């Protein structure tokens, strides 16, 4: 189940998709403005965040599953089409939702993360190559149970790894 906070409007639907580690609340300042401009606004908690379901299996967080969640929100709200806006991790989710469901999406906006077309290798394999020997949160989450155990033991360590793990040159902070 995907948690959504909806503000009724009289116009087209805009689905707002947050980044990592955030929730729908990241959009709290944009929601009233977009609603006042005549849009119906749905800011969601992405699967695994906030009020949405949190499946244990890593495969439940595939891009296909995440894009299906966005389409599910559009359907649940009774709209045929929607405008999508995503920031950070929400960017790839909205870009891929649009690419896989072009007849359902009237516009897409990605903030802070550009569109990356599918390459010859998976995104995870690309990250493994780029971040060899360095911490990168998306790779960290691929190790089943490891992140969860470390969060419970020491949330501060997780936050330091996530926010202060590498500098602009890819060097690990100490």
List where the protein language model places each region:
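Short, small-residue-biased leader/transition segments that mark boundaries at the very start
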Residues: 1-3
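Flexible "cap/lid" subdomain of the alpha/beta-hydrolase fold that forms the substrate-access gate
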Residues: 6, 13, 49-85, 89-174
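Conserved HGGG/HGGXW glycine-rich cap/lid loop of the alpha/beta-hydrolase fold
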Residues: 7-53, 87
């Amino acid at each position: 189940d995907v948690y959504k906070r909806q503000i009724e409007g009289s116009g087209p639907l805009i689905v707002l998709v947050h980044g990592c580690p955030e929730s729908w609340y990241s959009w709290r300042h944009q929601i009233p403005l977009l609603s006042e401009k005549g849009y119906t606004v749905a800011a969601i908690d992405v699967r695994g965040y906030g009020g949405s379901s949190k499946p244990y299996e890593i495969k439940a967080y595939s891009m296909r599953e995440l894009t299906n969640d966005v389409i599910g929100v559009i359907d649940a709200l009774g709209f045929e089409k929607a405008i999508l806006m995503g920031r950070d991790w929400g960017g790839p989710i909205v870009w891929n939702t649009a690419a896989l469901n072009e007849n359902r999406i009237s516009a897409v906006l990605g903030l802070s993360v550009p569109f990356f077309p599918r390459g010859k290798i998976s995104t995870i394999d690309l990250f493994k190559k780029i971040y060899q020997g360095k911490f990168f949160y998306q790779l960290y989450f691929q190790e089943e149970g490891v992140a969860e155990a470390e969060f419970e033991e020491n949330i501060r360590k997780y936050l330091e790894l996530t926010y202060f793990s590498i500098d602009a040159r890819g060097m690990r902070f100490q």
